[in-house]
Amino acid sequence: MGNIILLTGFQPFLDYSINPTEAIVKELNGRKIGEYEVRGVILPVSFRESGDLLLHHFQTVQPTAVFMLGLAAGRGKITPERVAININSGPEDRDGIAPVDEPIRQGGPAAYFSTLPVRRLIQRLNEEGFPAEMSNSAGTYVCNHVMYRMLDYLHEKGSEQVAAGFVHLPASKELAAQHHSLPSMDLKDLTRAVTLMIEEL
């Protein structure tokens, strides 16, 4: 069996009726990209369920890389995340839970760095004409939650050879049509950008 990459996206959330990461993951699921076979998973925007579901799929699939996607409505560039922090805080999730400054894991490390080759991903995207830059904050919402949970799990299991990290994407044009002030990119371009990043791993 070749290398498997676990590619995750999210369902729509808050007042965003479309989440482009959901469409991208569905489009790329089952594809062969570079040396990887893509296994796609759509996660709920839920502090309570998203991390457990992610780890369940990781244990089932046993991938050699984990590439997590999320929507950063308002950002105009593709932004690979450098770090995840041990905090849950934000507006109500799908379950009506709105934590305030709660640790993701009591006693866990304050932060974990992405183990993806973040700068190389950005360079590849820029070379291909995509606006991209590093982000030093994945926020404190569910995107940060799943990034932290994944990296914490790999650290605790001594499986840090598995490349894992998170990339935030701008809104798609379909979503921006509903929220006119949002910077956006075409969904096909976002899908192409994700494909390029996976090729670069």
Curated annotation (Swiss-Prot):
Record's subcellular location: Cytoplasm
EC primary class: hydrolase
UniProt KW keywords: Cytoplasm, Hydrolase, Protease, Thiol protease
Main location: cytoplasm
Molecular function GO labels: pyroglutamyl-peptidase activity
Reactions catalysed: Release of an N-terminal pyroglutamyl group from a polypeptide, the second amino acid generally not being Pro
A Gene Ontology term for the protein's cellular component: cytosol
EC number(s) stated in the UniProt entry for this protein: 3.4.19.3
One of the GO biological process terms: proteolysis
Entry-linked PROSITE patterns: PYRASE_CYS, PYRASE_GLU
UniProt-annotated catalytic positions: 81, 143, 168
Family membership noted in the UniProt record: Belongs to the peptidase C15 family.
Physiological role: Removes 5-oxoproline from various penultimate amino acid residues except L-proline.
Subunit description: Homotetramer.
NCBIfam families: PRK13197.1, pyro_pdase
Protein name: Pyrrolidone-carboxylate peptidase
Organism: Halalkalibacterium halodurans (strain ATCC BAA-125 / DSM 18197 / FERM 7344 / JCM 9153 / C-125) (Bacillus halodurans)
Source taxonomy: Bacteria, Bacillati, Bacillota, Bacilli, Bacillales
Gene name of the record: pcp
